[in-house]
Amino acid sequence: MQFIRGGKLTDANNLSKAQRVAYIDERLQALYPETPIPLDHSDPYTLLIAVLLSAQCTDERVNQVTPALFTKADCPEQMIQLSVEEIRSIIRPCGLSPQKSKAIHRLSELLLADHSGAVPANLEALEQLPGVGHKTASVVMAQAFGMPTFPVDTHIHRLAQRWGLTRGRNVVETERDLKRAFPKERWNALHLQIIYYGREYCTARGCDGRVCEICTTCYPARKHPKRCNKT
């Protein structure tokens, strides 16, 4: 099995990590030249809320729920006028509604108190908000403000291991390895491209490291399922 890189034919049976990185980068750019943001939003605040709601929930479900929420409140000033229970009743289909509704209400209060109602374009400041972890903050920094980050969730963690890009034991270590492997200007697009590819070709159950194009190109001799470290 061979692929073209820089005009040269390369034997995929002997891919180095650098060659795997180059091939994966090339292939994902070819498959997904455009990287639309999957969560519907109109500004940094609505994106922040949508990303928070997407924890353990599909983007499709979030996009079904947020119109009803944002019709009532699409800014911190309006959100704090709703009760936690009102928020909870709207977002219930997204799951974890008791925790998420409290976080949405409280972070809206803090944005008004500490940031004049604006979502801060600062990773550390975002991580201080209720319900906002490193991955959520990284997504907001990348998609709302265009700052180079490489948000890694369990799905990206799994694919990075299948593709031999990391031996990370968790998403923190995998994020570190991916940032080292790819140029900074590719981080934001790659985050989305890997997600798109994983959903379409390298699914959790549909590919065990021996099925999809990237897995078979990078590891044509792999005979056993690739076991991935869980986060």
Where are these regions (language model features)?
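Catalytic cores of DNA base-excision repair glycosylases
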Residues: 3, 9-230
